[in-house]
Amino acid sequence: MKDREHTEKRILEAVGSIIENDGFEKIGVNAIAQRAGVSKMLIYRYFGGIDELIAQYLLQKDYW
């Protein structure tokens, strides 16, 4: 697995962890970055923002 793929996976796992443990209302770039151990800038670079990140998480989990 490439570094970027590994990092994206960690970020998406952080989203899931926050939803499961803290609730959807606690989702934010700061919380996700801290949980994933990455910078906020990296999240914006990889996903464009919180909306795209949540959309990617939901697609990955096949919620739709």
Range-by-range predicted roles:
Residues 22, 42-44, 55:
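Intrinsically disordered, low-complexity segments enriched in small/polar residues
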Residues 37-47:
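Short hydrophobic/aromatic patch on the recognition helix
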